[in-house]
From Swiss-Prot:
It comes from the Eukaryota. Anterior dorsal follicle cells at stages 10-12 of oogenesis. It is found in: Cytoplasm; Nucleus. Residues 82-103 are annotated as: Leucine-zipper. It comes from Drosophila melanogaster (Fruit fly). The gene is bun. Probable transcription factor required for peripheral nervous system morphogenesis, eye development and oogenesis. May be required for the transmission of the dpp signal and for a morphogenetic movement of the medulla in the brain that reorients the second optic lobe relative to the first. Plays a role in determining proper dorsal cell fates leading to the formation of the dorsal appendages. One of its GO terms (molecular function) is protein homodimerization activity. This is Protein bunched, class 1/class 3/D/E isoforms. GO terms for cellular component: cytosol; nucleus. PANTHER family: TSC22 DOMAIN FAMILY PROTEIN 1 (PTHR46745:SF1). InterPro entries: TSC22/Bun, TSC22/BUN_CS. Keywords: Cytoplasm, Developmental protein, Differentiation, Nucleus, Oogenesis, Transcription, Transcription regulation.
Length: 219
């Protein structure tokens, strides 16, 4: 591999590349990577030739300038492509916004509300709202339990008052099922209880009178 032909981008001169051009520097074997770099420099920049350190540095600087220029060209091309793409997207957005405004102005209000409702239903539910619901239920549950306990206590007091009231033994507070037969039976039982109480009072009065007669009047 002694020579190879190639063409420079700046001119059409055919260059012979000597791969064994820099076998060593100051009696030491050259780095393989540096050798490859130097070969590419000789291929693309044939004007900067020589074996001195200054010539090598010049070639490296020229190679770096060449790389920078290629990178700048590539970046500019990419920027132009991105600008075109952004411009196309902006035009599309403007067109869609115009179509949306036209549709909103011509669509019935009911249909628009239905669409908004469908969008709300299709949207994922909010996680904080779901997490807050059990807390509300836990607050409502003790309140409901407290109300139930209060109602039970009030019912117990009412039942106790009915059981201890003398009038409750005479007159019933309610008539089951609202029928005439049940009403008459309740009245009859109340009358019987009244008669029994009258008899008890009469017998007690007679007993007291007999005691007074037997013992005589008190002086």
């Amino acid at each position: 591999m002694k020579t190879e032909t190639g063409s420079n981008n700046n001119n059409t001169t055919v260059v012979n590349m000597d791969f064994d051009m820099y076998p060593s520097i100051s009696g030491k074997q050259q780095d393989p990577v540096r050798e490859v770099v130097m070969k590419y420099i000789d291929y693309f920049l044939p004007d900067a030739s020589g074996t001195s350190a200054v010539a090598i540095d010049n070639k490296i600087e020229q190679a770096m300038d060449l790389v920078k220029s290629h990178l700048m060209i590539a970046v500019r091309e990419e920027v132009e492509v991105l600008k075109e793409r952004i411009s196309e997207l902006m035009d599309k957005i403007n067109k869609l916004e115009l179509e949306n405004s036209i549709l909103k102005s011509n669509i019935p209000q009911e249909t628009l509300q239905q669409l908004q409702l469908q969008l709300q239903l299709a949207a994922p539910p909010a996680t904080p709202a779901i997490q807050a619901a059990p807390a509300v239920q836990s607050v409502v549950a003790p309140a409901a339990a407290g109300q139930a306990v209060q109602q039970q206590a009030a019912g117990a007091v009412a039942v106790t008052g009915v059981a201890t009231s003398p009038a409750s033994a005479v007159v019933p507070t309610s008539i089951p099922n609202g029928s005439a037969e049940n009403g008459s039976s309740a009245v009859e039982s109340a009358a019987v209880s009244v008669e029994q109480q009258v008899q008890q009072v009469t017998s007690a009065a007679a007993a007291a009178a007999s005691v007074v007669t037997a013992n005589g009047p008190m002086s």
